[in-house]
Amino acid sequence: MKLTIALSKGRIFEETLPLLAAAGIVPAENPESSRKLIIGTNHPDVQLVIVRASDVPTYVQYGAADLGIAGRDVLIEHGGAGLYQPLDLNIAKCKMMVAVQEGFDYDAAVRRGARLKIATKYPQIAREHFAKKGVHVDIIKLYGSMELAPLVGLADAIVDLVSTGGTLRANKLAAVEHIIDISSRLVVNQAALKLKYDAIQPVLDAFAGAVPA
């Protein structure tokens, strides 16, 4: 019974390797250097598919992958339909923040009821956050270089992931509001969990035992 695990390249993959090892799964190739999108492992019945981070939940939802690892940010934007989320893996940690150009008085703008333009890759998270605060916003969906938006007058603020804050500082932006903590989660196709329980559950147990504190 073949198991397919959806992963994305980069930080999440690197921090997933010890968890895979705990489950006895070792990739046959390094996806960072391989052009292959389907990578075998030391188990003939386990394969990895390498996809964009934002596509991991979709591959799992529709059964193209049985399991996947995705950031909480991606899962919120996706909506989580058809997914079982049994485990917070405590990897790839960062924070979702509101950031503005240095010198912009965000609190004053909020207090006076200004309608703010918000640039973000995460419209669902941003919309929910500002709705809870009762702040009127126009969401501008971007796919990269969020930090540029306030500098050229496209937006008053951005909603983005912040790890060290170095990129914000380099572009004279400052984080002004914390929205949520982000880490990566293990997600499982709900139908696959029933049909392939004997194959999937040992992987879940091994991951649970290896999650960093």
Curated annotation (Swiss-Prot):
Gene3D superfamilies: Periplasmic binding protein-like II. Keywords: Amino-acid biosynthesis, ATP-binding, Cytoplasm, Glycosyltransferase, Histidine biosynthesis, Nucleotide-binding, Transferase. It catalyses: 1-(5-phospho-beta-D-ribosyl)-ATP + diphosphate = 5-phospho-alpha-D-ribose 1-diphosphate + ATP. GO terms for molecular function: ATP binding; ATP phosphoribosyltransferase activity. SUPFAM superfamilies: Periplasmic binding protein-like II. One of its GO terms (biological process) is L-histidine biosynthetic process. Its EC number is 2.4.2.17. GO terms for cellular component: cytoplasm. Pathway: Amino-acid biosynthesis; L-histidine biosynthesis; L-histidine from 5-phospho-alpha-D-ribose 1-diphosphate: step 1/9. Its main location: cytoplasm. It is found in: Cytoplasm. CDD domains: PBP2_HisGs. Heteromultimer composed of HisG and HisZ subunits. Lacks the C-terminal regulatory region which is replaced by HisZ. Catalyzes the condensation of ATP and 5-phosphoribose 1-diphosphate to form N'-(5'-phosphoribosyl)-ATP (PR-ATP). Has a crucial role in the pathway because the rate of histidine biosynthesis seems to be controlled primarily by regulation of HisG enzymatic activity. Belongs to the ATP phosphoribosyltransferase family. Short subfamily. This is ATP phosphoribosyltransferase. The lineage of its organism: Bacteria, Pseudomonadati, Pseudomonadota, Betaproteobacteria, Neisseriales.
